[in-house]
A protein has these predicted regions:
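Glycine-rich His-Gly loop
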Residues: 68-72, 193-194, 231
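A catalytic-pocket lid/entrance helix-loop region that shapes and gates access to the active site
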Residues: 204-253
């Protein structure tokens, strides 16, 4: 059909991927956190919280820390481009004082059962057939064979990796990197993309000690604000109110 408007002029690029990579680093980190065995034993990999840390290579004290959760079909690495560009832009801006940002992107615990061997090898080789052969044709990679796709009966322990696990994992990452509660209130932000943005709102209202008479442990008491990407919400004080319009990059602080 007809385009709704004429194409816009191409925006001049003022930096390259190499510029960003020279300034910003991405690190894969883990926190030991034994998973529940209530519904059966779990693989050793599931006893770790997995996440990525994005920060300036010089590793200065951050002015702000963003803890982000991915959408329903994504993992923590989905934030790689956004996090790096955001950190670079904040540090190199000329219209105001540079900011030192840090981004922590947290995987949901059930990502621990993923076998990314074929996908990683295909990406490195720039050949999708490598992944197809590994996952569907029984071709090993570095001596490793794909163990097959799992059914629910194979992974009963996933029943314990629900909403509470997500909240506890994100809180553990946040408090590990920003241990001072006052610092968290001043410079830590919780957020996410799509479903991850919804989970950010859940975090803000989560009661971490299970005692409704205490408030210091509540999620909203441990962050300076909430950031949402590709999401919308309805104000809690009105069931009749229409959701606020969502934008492609929308933040609520």
């Amino acid at each position: 059909g007809t385009l709704p408007e004429p194409p816009k002029a191409r925006v001049a690029v003022d930096h390259s991927t190499a510029d960003v990579d020279a300034l910003v680093e991405q690190r894969f980190l883990q926190l030991a956190s034994p998973a529940s065995t209530f519904n059966g034993p779990v693989p050793a990999a599931c006893d770790q919280i997995q996440y990525y840390q994005f920060r300036l290579r010089s590793a200065p004290e951050p002015d702000a820390v963003l803890v982000l959760m991915p959408g329903v079909y994504s993992g923590a690495n989905v934030f790689s481009y956004l996090a790096k560009e955001l950190i670079y832009a904040a540090h190199t801006r000329t219209d105001a004082a540079p900011l030192n940002l840090e981004v922590l992107a947290v995987d949901r615990r059930d990502n621990c059962i993923e076998d990314l061997t074929g996908l990683n090898a295909a990406e490195q080789a720039r050949d999708t057939q490598v992944a197809l052969d590994y996952y569907f044709n029984g071709v090993p990679l570095d001596g490793q064979l794909f163990d097959g796709f799992k059914s629910s009966d194979d992974v009963p322990y996933l029943s314990e990796m629900g909403l509470a696990q997500v909240m506890e994992d994100v809180h553990a990452v946040l408090t590990t990197h920003v241990p001072d509660p006052l610092q968290r209130q001043q410079k830590a932000f919780i957020g996410g993309h799509s479903m991850g943005a919804s989970l950010a709102w859940v975090y803000a209202g989560w009661d971490f000690d299970g005692d409704e008479t205490t408030l210091a442990d509540a999620g909203y008491q441990n962050v300076a604000g909430v950031i949402r990407l590709d999401s919308r919400y309805t104000p809690a004080d009105s069931q009749e109110a229409a959701p606020l319009p969502a934008t492609e990059n929308d933040a609520v602080i």
